[in-house]
C-alpha cells in the first residue's frame, strides 16, 4: 500500500472515529437535522452582544459540538477560511459580522434555530429584525469589557420585543477578565435581576473549567477541542464561595418566583429540580437572568450553555404572539396566534429580512401559525398579492437545504416573493390579519455618492435598488439643490460597507463625499395660520381656505410628524382633508431655514372654507403649502441635531486628554469608571462634532484608545451652530445673508 493510500485511509479512519465519538457523546448525525420535532423540542434563539464579544466564535463552537460542522475555523483565523456564519467575503476580511445569518442544528434531540447578529451599532437593524422573530436570546458579554454601549442597545431591543435571555460571560481566558465585575454591571447598568448559575474555576491562563451551582458539580472540558466532559467534585478551595453564590442564586430566584419563594420562607430544602423549574419560569417571564461563564475560543463552557438553552429558554408554544385584525373605523382586534404544529389553523408568517441570493430575492420568514407546503398559495396582507410557493428552504449560513413543509415555530426562506421587511403572509386574504412590524430607526448620516465610471450607471442602479430593499435604514435620494445623489444610513461604517459591496458584488467602484449630518427643523412654539388659496381666471378655478395651528410635539417625539383633523361640520369637506395632509407632508420634506426635513410638529386643521365648484383636493393641498410658508415667516424655528452616546476606553494616564477632547466637541460627560489601569468615559456628543474623532483619539492615546457611539436622540443645536448651518444653506442657495438683504430693502 502506497504512503498516500495509507494516509488517505488513516484520515478516513480518524474522521470515522471522530464521528463515532460524536455519536457516543450524544451528538447527532446530519440526516436528523431536517426532521420536524414536536413544539417542546424546538428553540429559536439569537446570539447578540457588543462588537468583539465573541458571538460568531461562540456560534462556530455550537455548530461544531452539535455535529453541524466537521471542523472549526476562527473569525480572523490563519487558515483564511473564516467562521461559518461570516459568509460574506467582506465579513471575513474585516473580522466583523455585517448581516445576521441563520442556521439550525440539533442538540439532545431538540432542534435549535440560531441567528448570529452583528454587534456594530451601524448594523443595529439586523439585530432588531432577528429579535422580532425569536423566542429567546443569548446575550454574550466580554469578561474584560463587561456591559458596553451596544450591550445596552441590545438589552433595550430585547425589552421592546419581550425576549427572554440567558447571559454568557465569554473570554474568561483574556488578561484582565473579571466576571464578578460584569455581573455587578448587569445589575447596575441594565437593571437585571441576575445571578451566577456557574462559576469559573480560575480565570485568564488558569481557566480550567466551571462549577455548576445548580448541580453542585465541577465540569472539566478535556480531549481535543474540549469535547470530553468530566464531572467531578467542586475543588476544595472553591467550596465556600460556591455555597455563598448558590445561596445568592436562591435568594434572587425567590424574589422573582412565588413557588420557590414559599419554600425559601418555610426554610424547606431545595432539590435540583426545584431550582431548575424556578429558573425556567423566571427566565421566560423576564424576571430573572441566569448568568453562565466560559471561553468559546478555548472550548470551555459551550456545552452547558446549550443545555441551558434547552432547560431555561422558551419553546415557541410558551411565547404569546399576537396578530391584529383590521376593522374599518375601529381599533384593530388582537388575536393570539396558535403555535400548535398540527396545521389546523391557517398559515401566518412574518417576513423579517430580504436578501438578493444567487437565484433571485431570498425572503426570510418565521412561521407563527399553521403549516406551509410546497405548492401552496399565500397572500401578502399589505398588498393582497398572491404568491405560489415553488421552493421552501431552510438555511445554514449561505447554504440552503430544501424542505417540503414548515410548521409553526420554524424559520425558513422563500424565493421570488415581492414584499418588504415586516410584511405578514397568510393563506386566507379575507381575515385582514397582520402582525406587528419591525421598528426601524431613522438614518443619521448622509454622504454624496457617485460611480467612478459613467459606464457603471446600470450596475450602480441595480446595487442601490437591491440594498435599499434589503436594508430599511439605508436610504437613497437625489438632492435637487446641490444636484447630488445622496445615500443615508446609521453611520460612516454603514455607508462605507455598502460602497465596498458595490465594487465587489457589482463591479462598480464609487466615490463617497464627506459625511453630512441629518439635521431637522422644528417649531419653538405654536403658530396659528389662516390661509386662502384662490385662483379664478375663467373656467374651473381653485378655491380652498384652511385655518388651524402648527405646534411643537414633546421632546420625546421630536422625530415624528402628526396631522390632526379637528374640523366640525362641512366647511372643509372630509374628501379634501387628505389633500391638506398630503400638502403638509410634502412641505415637511424640506424646511426653509436650512433645507432639512421638518420633524416634531403637529398640524391641527381646525376650520376653513370651500367653493361648491372650484374646490378640489389639489386646491386644498396648495392651500396647505401656502399655510406652511406663512408659518415659516411668522413662527419661531430651531434646528435639531442627532446626539450620540459615546463610550471611550483608554489607559488611565490619558484620561485628562480624552475628557478634554470630548468637552471641546461640546460633549457632556455622563459617567466614568476605572479598572486596573484603564478607564471608560461615557458622554453625549453631537454627531456633527464627532467626525475625525477616531484619528484624534488614536494620536492622543498612542493608539491604545478605542470608542463606540450610537444614536440617542435629537436635541436643539447651540445658537452659534444653528447660525452657521443657516448661513451655509443660504450661501449654497445663492441667497444674500439676512443682514445684507435688509440693507438692499
UniProtKB/Swiss-Prot annotation:
Its main location: mitochondrion. GO terms for biological process: mitochondrial translational elongation. Keywords: Elongation factor, GTP-binding, Mitochondrion, Nucleotide-binding, Protein biosynthesis. CDD domains: EF-G (cd01886), EFG_III (cd16262), EFG_mtEFG1_IV (cd01434), mtEFG1_C (cd04097), mtEFG1_II_like (cd04091). Mitochondrial GTPase that catalyzes the GTP-dependent ribosomal translocation step during translation elongation. During this step, the ribosome changes from the pre-translocational (PRE) to the post-translocational (POST) state as the newly formed A-site-bound peptidyl-tRNA and P-site-bound deacylated tRNA move to the P and E sites, respectively. Catalyzes the coordinated movement of the two tRNA molecules, the mRNA and conformational changes in the ribosome. This protein may be expected to contain an N-terminal transit peptide but none has been predicted. This is Elongation factor G, mitochondrial. It comes from Drosophila yakuba.
Amino acid at each position: 500500500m502506497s504512503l498516500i493510500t495509507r494516509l488517505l485511509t488513516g484520515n478516513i479512519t480518524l474522521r470515522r472515529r471522530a464521528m463515532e465519538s460524536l455519536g457516543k457523546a450524544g451528538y447527532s448525525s446530519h440526516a436528523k437535522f431536517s426532521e420536524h420535532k414536536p413544539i417542546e423540542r424546538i428553540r429559536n434563539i439569537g446570539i447578540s452582544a457588543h462588537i468583539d464579544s465573541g458571538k460568531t466564535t461562540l456560534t462556530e463552537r455550537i455548530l461544531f459540538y452539535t455535529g453541524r460542522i466537521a471542523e472549526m475555523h476562527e473569525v480572523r483565523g490563519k487558515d483564511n477560511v473564516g467562521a461559518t456564519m461570516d459568509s460574506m467575503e467582506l465579513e471575513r476580511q474585516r473580522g466583523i459580522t455585517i448581516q445576521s445569518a441563520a442556521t439550525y442544528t440539533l442538540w439532545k434531540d431538540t432542534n435549535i434555530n440560531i441567528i448570529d447578529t452583528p454587534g456594530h451599532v451601524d448594523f443595529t437593524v439586523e439585530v432588531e429584525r432577528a429579535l422580532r422573530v425569536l423566542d429567546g436570546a443569548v446575550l454574550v458579554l466580554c469578561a474584560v469589557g463587561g456591559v458596553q454601549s451596544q450591550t445596552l442597545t441590545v438589552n433595550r431591543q430585547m425589552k421592546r420585543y419581550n425576549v427572554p435571555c440567558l447571559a454568557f460571560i465569554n473570554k474568561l481566558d483574556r488578561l484582565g477578565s473579571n466576571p464578578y465585575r460584569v455581573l455587578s454591571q448587569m445589575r447596575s447598568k441594565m437593571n437585571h435581576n441576575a445571578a451566577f448559575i456557574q462559576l469559573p474555576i480560575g480565570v485568564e491562563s488558569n481557566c480550567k473549567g466551571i462549577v455548576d451551582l445548580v448541580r453542585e458539580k465541577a465540569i472539566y472540558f478535556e480531549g481535543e477541542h474540549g469535547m470530553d466532559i468530566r464531572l467531578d467534585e467542586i475543588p476544595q478551595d472553591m467550596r465556600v464561595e460556591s455555597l455563598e453564590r448558590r445561596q445568592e442564586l436562591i435568594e434572587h430566584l425567590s424574589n422573582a418566583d412565588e413557588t420557590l419563594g414559599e419554600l425559601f420562607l418555610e426554610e424547606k430544602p431545595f432539590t435540583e429540580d426545584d431550582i431548575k423549574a424556578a429558573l425556567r419560569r423566571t427566565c421566560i417571564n423576564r424576571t430573572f437572568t441566569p448568568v453562565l461563564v466560559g471561553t468559546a475560543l478555548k472550548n470551555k463552557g459551550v456545552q452547558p450553555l446549550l443545555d441551558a438553552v434547552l432547560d431555561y429558554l422558551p419553546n415557541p408554544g410558551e411565547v404569546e404572539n399576537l396578530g391584529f385584525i383590521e376593522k374599518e373605523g375601529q381599533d384593530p382586534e388582537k388575536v393570539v396566534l396558535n403555535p400548535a404544529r398540527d396545521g389546523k389553523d391557517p398559515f401566518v408568517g412574518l417576513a423579517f429580512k430580504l436578501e438578493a441570493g444567487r437565484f433571485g430575492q431570498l425572503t426570510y420568514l418565521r412561521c407563527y401559525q399553521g403549516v406551509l407546503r410546497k405548492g401552496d398559495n399565500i397572500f401578502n396582507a399589505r398588498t393582497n398579492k398572491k404568491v405560489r410557493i415553488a421552493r421552501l428552504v431552510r438555511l445554514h449560513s449561505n447554504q440552503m437545504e430544501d424542505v417540503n413543509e414548515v410548521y409553526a415555530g420554524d424559520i425558513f426562506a422563500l424565493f421570488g416573493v415581492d414584499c418588504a421587511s415586516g410584511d405578514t403572509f397568510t393563506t386566507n386574504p379575507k381575515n385582514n390579519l397582520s402582525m406587528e412590524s419591525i421598528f426601524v430607526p431613522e438614518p443619521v448620516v448622509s454622504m454624496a455618492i457617485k460611480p467612478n465610471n459613467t459606464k457603471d450607471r446600470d450596475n450602480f442602479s441595480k446595487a442601490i435598488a437591491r440594498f435599499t430593499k434589503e436594508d430599511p435604514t439605508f436610504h437613497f435620494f437625489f438632492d435637487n439643490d446641490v444636484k447630488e445623489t445622496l445615500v443615508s444610513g446609521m453611520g460612516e461604517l454603514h455607508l462605507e460597507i455598502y460602497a465596498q459591496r458595490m465594487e465587489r458584488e457589482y463591479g462598480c467602484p464609487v466615490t463617497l463625499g464627506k459625511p453630512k449630518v441629518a439635521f431637522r427643523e422644528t417649531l419653538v412654539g405654536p403658530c396659528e395660520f389662516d390661509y386662502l388659496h384662490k385662483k379664478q381666471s375663467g373656467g374651473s378655478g381653485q378655491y380652498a381656505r384652511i385655518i388651524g395651528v402648527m405646534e411643537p410635539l414633546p421632546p420625546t417625539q421630536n422625530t415624528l410628524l402628526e396631522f390632526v383633523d379637528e374640523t366640525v361640520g362641512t366647511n372643509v369637506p372630509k374628501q379634501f382633508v387628505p389633500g391638506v395632509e398630503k400638502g403638509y407632508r410634502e412641505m415637511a420634506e424640506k424646511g426653509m431655514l436650512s433645507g432639512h426635513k421638518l420633524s416634531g410638529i403637529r398640524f391641527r386643521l381646525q376650520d376653513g372654507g370651500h367653493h361648491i365648484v372650484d374646490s378640489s383636493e389639489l386646491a386644498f393641498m396648495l392651500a396647505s403649502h401656502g399655510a406652511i410658508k406663512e408659518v415659516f415667516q411668522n413662527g419661531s424655528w430651531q434646528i435639531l441635531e442627532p446626539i450620540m452616546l459615546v463610550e471611550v476606553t483608554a489607559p488611565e494616564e490619558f484620561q485628562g486628554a480624552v475628557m478634554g477632547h470630548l468637552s471641546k466637541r461640546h460633549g457632556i460627560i455622563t459617567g466614568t469608571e476605572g479598572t486596573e489601569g484603564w478607564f471608560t468615559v461615557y458622554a453625549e456628543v453631537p454627531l456633527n462634532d464627532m467626525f475625525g474623532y477616531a484619528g484624534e483619539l488614536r494620536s492622543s492615546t498612542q493608539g491604545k484608545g478605542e470608542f463606540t457611539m450610537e444614536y440617542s436622540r435629537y436635541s436643539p443645536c447651540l445658537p452659534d451652530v444653528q447660525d452657521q448651518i443657516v448661513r451655509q444653506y443660504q450661501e449654497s442657495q445663492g441667497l444674500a445673508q439676512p443682514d445684507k438683504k435688509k440693507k438692499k430693502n
